[in-house]
């Protein structure tokens, strides 16, 4: 439910600043090709205290593992072990990771295991999208949630006990070539595409390292001439990523989360002259039951029939907002807060202003 406090909180915390500050290149752009790679694998968690899986594939996986160790069970045997869980294991392989380095691993239950707390992940190969093994994972799980149940069926769950982590549980076995040391240029890709930011980035690099060092190919990418010797290229990029650049001011936007009622209004949002009337309709639904009782000795049966009553009422007085030409977001928020409206009211008002053409901003609903 939306409240007046959340509107005020939105006005205080969720307003973008109109002032642009210089930022480092490393905060504005990424180096093309220098990125993490996602890895995934399938494994088993053992040592659970009766909170494991009750699925056929967990049984099958356990039997397959036992067969690899020379323990052959008769066909059709079911282990029915409640201390084992089938899990998906995934991790991010950072750029430039070398063989032998450790990475963190996340483990998620695939079946109906109640909790992974106290479990140990057995050796699991982690593969990339190309099917090659890039890391091996194994270790004791750290689980933030818990699950407890009583003999009478009562149960309590805190957070998510079916997901855990193994810090440093993955060992890199194979490196990924980033192509960082190839070619005569380095490509910088802006995190937020903007022609002004790209131009300012080119100008800042050329001012620092000489004219013609950098040039923009579009609103997102900037090519920088760089030395080919790896040591020199690393030092060169170290200089570039610490150059300060003034980013361009983003276009006027209003972002609305229709599920939570969160509204973010950009600092450049303005409204043309407009008047808005907004009122709330309250729909009330009441359910009751009518009982039809036959007369004494009539031989009939008592009948119970549902009865529904619907009513539509207007809650509160109509709200009138009058905005002069060029009004800013401060005026909008103050006007809505003054009448004690909720974020839901503000959403409806902004949508109506956009439809009328009075709102000079992009309205984005997420």
From Swiss-Prot:
Record's keyword terms, sorted: Bacterial flagellum, Periplasm, Signal
Function: Assembles around the rod to form the L-ring and probably protects the motor/basal body from shearing forces during rotation.
Record GO biological process: bacterial-type flagellum-dependent cell motility
Protein source organism: Hydrogenovibrio crunogenus (strain DSM 25203 / XCL-2)
Gene Ontology terms, MF aspect: structural molecule activity
Protein name (record): Flagellar P-ring protein
Keyword Signal: yes
GO cellular component terms attached to this protein's record: bacterial-type flagellum basal body, distal rod, P ring; outer membrane-bounded periplasmic space
Subcellular localization(s) per the UniProt record: Periplasm; Bacterial flagellum basal body
Stated family: Belongs to the FlgI family.
InterPro entries: Flag_FlgI
UniProt entry tagged with the keyword Signal: yes
Organism lineage: Bacteria, Pseudomonadati, Pseudomonadota, Gammaproteobacteria, Thiotrichales
Subunit structure: The basal body constitutes a major portion of the flagellar organelle and consists of four rings (L,P,S, and M) mounted on a central rod.
Principal location class: periplasm
């Amino acid at each position: 439910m939306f409240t007046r406090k959340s509107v005020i909180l939105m006005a205080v915390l969720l307003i973008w600043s109109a002032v642009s500050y210089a930022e480092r290149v490393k905060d504005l752009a990424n180096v093309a090709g220098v990125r993490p790679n996602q890895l995934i694998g399938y494994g088993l968690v053992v040592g659970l205290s009766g909170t494991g899986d009750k699925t056929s594939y967990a049984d099958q996986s356990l039997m397959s593992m036992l067969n690899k160790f020379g323990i052959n069970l008769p066909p059709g045997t079911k282990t029915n072990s409640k201390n084992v869980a089938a899990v998906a294991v995934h991790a991010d392989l950072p750029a430039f990771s070398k063989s032998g380095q450790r990475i963190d691993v996340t483990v998620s239950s695939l079946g109906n295991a109640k909790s992974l707390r106290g479990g140990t992940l057995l050796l699991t190969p982690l593969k990339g999208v190309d099917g090659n093994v890039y890391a091996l994972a194994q270790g004791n799980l750290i689980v933030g949630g818990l699950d407890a149940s009583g003999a009478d069926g009562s149960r309590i769950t805190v957070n998510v006990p079916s997901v855990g982590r193994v810090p440093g549980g993955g060992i890199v076995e194979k490196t990924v070539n980033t192509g960082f040391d190839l070619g005569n240029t380095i490509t910088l890709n802006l995190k937020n595409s903007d022609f002004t930011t790209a131009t300012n980035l080119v100008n800042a690099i050329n001012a620092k390292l000489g004219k013609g060092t950098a040039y923009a190919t579009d609103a997102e990418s900037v090519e920088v001439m760089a030395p080919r010797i790896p040591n020199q290229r690393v030092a060169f990029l170290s200089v570039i990523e610490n150059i300060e650049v003034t980013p361009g001011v983003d276009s006027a936007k209003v972002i609305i989360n229709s599920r939570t009622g969160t509204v973010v209004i950009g600092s450049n949002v303005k409204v043309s002259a407009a008047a808005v009337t907004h009122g709330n309709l309250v729909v009330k639904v009441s359910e009751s039951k009518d009982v039809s009782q036959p007369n004494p000795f009539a031989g009939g049966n008592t009948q119970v029939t549902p009865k529904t009553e619907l009513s539509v009422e207007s809650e509160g007085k109509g709200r009138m907002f009058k905005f002069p030409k060029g009004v800013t977001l401060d005026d909008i928020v103050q006007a809505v807060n003054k009448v004690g409206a909720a974020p839901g009211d503000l959403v409806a008002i902004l949508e109506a202003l956009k439809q009328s053409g009075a709102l000079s901003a992009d309205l984005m609903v997420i």
